[in-house]
Regions:
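Structural beta-strand/beta-sheet cores of well-ordered domains, especially the beta-sheet scaffolds
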Residues: 55-57, 64-66, 117, 125-128, ...
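Aromatic- and carboxylate-enriched substrate-binding clefts and catalytic-loop regions
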Residues: 5, 16, 187-326
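Structured alpha-helical segments in the cores of large, soluble enzyme domains
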Residues: 137-150, 174-193, 274, 278-281, ...
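Short, surface-exposed, polar/charged, turn-prone segments marking secondary-structure boundaries
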Residues: 86-90, 95-99, 157-158, 189, ...
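N-terminal small/glycine-rich loop or linker at the start of catalytic domains
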Residues: 147-164, 248-262
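Catalytic and substrate-binding clefts that recognize carbohydrates or anionic sugar/phosphate headgroups
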Residues: 1-155, 164-167, 171, 178-183
Length: 326
């Protein structure tokens, strides 16, 4: 059942008594989600199993052989059989009513007595819901991957051993690590350089620091000869000194992050400016990029305010909430 109210969209999905559900993307602290309240929101510090995480998804699968995908970039709450509406309440057993809780844990424990998943999508005036059938959970996940586009198959080295050097690393220290690993026969496929490889961070210039890496092309050639792939750490907030800053000004949001522009990647122009510049780094010998700190400020602390707010506006018409999620 889907209902549109002044608040937004409310969705109800039936749950059987012996039904378990799993999902919501990358979740560190919970696996079986029945009886929980989940908010799969992009965030840099997953805490307490609430659903805040680096890679959330508004998708879950059921042991009954189906999956539910709520196709939205809005902050969405899933009550996974944790709450019961008045008209469907079950009569408590007499012995339960007589029980007196004597601890905080007992008093407020989750009794998992709901028979529906209640999905709350505030601000939505309509919603697209995909019901994906199995019959098995594995079949559901396979079909979800086909529906969502699947993604590319990573190269074998991308599944190998990685080592990242500290943010204050230099060309000489990187080569010392590289030589040490090979001399000691310590497996290492990828060397990651934290954002200190740039002239400015945070926000990012995307320009090599001549002070720390005076001959970076020579270093990349040497690392390639030793069998290393090189991964650069960065984020998408563009420093005033960046060569792409001016070009991105018309295609960025109305809030800064660390004095850096926030590109509106919904717009093809912003996407092209950003990727074209990064293609020059790939041509130099870089094999990949790690997008650090692109997953929102820690929403668990009032002092964590560095990221753009949910009310930010972007030229494409998207707001900050949706931009965080996409």
């Amino acid at each position: 059942q889907i209902k549109i109210t002044d608040r937004g969209c409310l969705i109800e999905v039936p749950l059987e008594d012996n039904e378990q559900i799993y999902g919501f993307g990358l979740q560190f602290e919970t696996f079986g989600q029945r009886g929980l309240r989940k908010r799969p929101i992009v965030n840099d510090n997953p805490l307490n199993g609430l659903g805040y995480t680096h890679a959330p998804q508004t998708f879950y699968v059921s042991t009954k052989g189906y999956g539910i995908l709520v196709n939205t970039a809005r902050y969405t709450t899933f009550l996974c059989g944790s709450n019961q509406k008045t008209e469907h309440s079950r009569q408590l057993q007499a012995e339960e009513r007589k029980h007196i809780a004597t601890t905080t844990e007992d008093l407020y424990k989750n009794r998992s007595n709901g028979n529906k998943v209640h999905i709350d999508v505030p601000g939505a005036k309509g919603i697209e819901v995909f019901i994906i059938t199995g019959p098995e959970v594995l079949d559901v996940v396979k079909r979800y991957n086909l529906l969502s586009g699947g993604g590319c198959l990573p190269p074998m080295w991308g599944l190998g051993f990685k080592y990242r050097v500290k943010g204050d690393a230099t060309q000489d220290s990187v080569m010392r690590f590289a030589n040490y690993f090979r001399e000691k026969q310590i497996p290492c496929d990828v060397l990651g350089l934290e954002p200190g490889w740039q002239t400015a961070t945070y926000s990012c210039s995307y320009r090599w620091s001549d002070d720390r890496f005076p001959r970076h092309k020579e270093m990349l050639d040497q690392l390639q000869q030793k069998g290393y792939k090189v991964n650069l750490w960065e984020h998408a907030y563009v420093h005033p000194s960046s060569p792409i800053r001016k070009a991105l000004e018309p295609y960025s949001g109305d809030f800064l992050v660390w004095n850096g522009l926030v590109p509106d990647f919904i717009q093809p122009e912003a996407h092209k400016i950003f990727t074209d510049y990064h293609r020059t780094l790939i041509e130099e010998g870089i094999s990949g990029f790690k997008l650090d700190e692109c997953d929102n400020s820690n929403i668990s602390f009032a002092s964590a305010t560095w990221c753009f707010p949910d009310m930010a506006q972007f030229p494409s018409g998207i707001d900050g909430e949706k931009m965080h999620q996409v």
